[in-house]
Amino acid sequence: MINEEKIIISNDINLGATIAYKDKKEKRPLVLLIMGTGTTDRDGNSFGFKTNLYKNLSDMFVEMGYVCIRYDKRGTHESTGDYKTGSLSDLVTDAANIIQYAKKLDYIDEEKVVVCGHSEGAMIATLLTRTEKLRGIILLGGACMGLKEALQYQNYLVFEQVQDMKGKRIVSPLYWPSM
C-alpha cells in the first residue's frame, strides 16, 4: 500500500509537495521528481489533461522501495512565489531546499538521494549535482542541445510543416537554422 502526505516546504517561498512511501519503519532511499517546463501540477496534469505522469512515476518508485517527493513549481498550484519571474537558478534552489528538507526526515537515507528530472527538470537535476551530494540522477526527455538551438530547430520544423500544407505557401522561413 502506498501512503501519501501533502506537505509544505518553506524557505523564501512555500512549495506544496506530496511525499509518498510504503512505511516509515526504516530508512529508505529518496527519489525527488522534478517536472518539465510549464505549470503542470505535481501529479503531471495541466490544462485539462489528466495524465498523472508524475503520480504514476512516484507510485513506481515507491513500489521499488523508495520514498518519493513530487512538488508544484514556484508560483503554481499550492506553491507561492512568482512563476513568471522565477529563474532557472531559483528552480535549482527550490529543488535543493526540498532535498535538504527530506534529508532531515528520520525515514530517509540521506546518503541515497536520487533526482529524476523530466524535460526542464532534467536540466535542473543536472545543475543540482554542483551543490548537492546525490547518489544518482535520472534524466527523462532532457534536451540534447542548447535552448537557442532547440528553439531554432522547432522554428525549422514548423516551417517545414507549413510548407507541406495544401493551399498555403510561405516564401521563406523566419529563421533558417544551420543543420
Task: Describe the role of every protein-language-model region.
Residues 1-26:
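N-terminal cap/lid segment of alpha/beta-hydrolase-fold proteins
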Residues 24-60:
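Short, surface-exposed "cap/lid" segments of acyl-processing enzymes
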Residues 34, 71-73, 140:
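Alpha/beta-hydrolase
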Residues 52-78:
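Conserved alpha/beta-hydrolase
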Residues 85-105:
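Alpha/beta-hydrolase active-site loop
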Residues 107-119:
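Alpha/beta-hydrolase fold nucleophile elbow
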Residues 122-132:
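Short glycine-enriched nucleophile-adjacent loop
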Residues 140-179:
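Accessory cap/linker subdomain of secreted extracellular hydrolases
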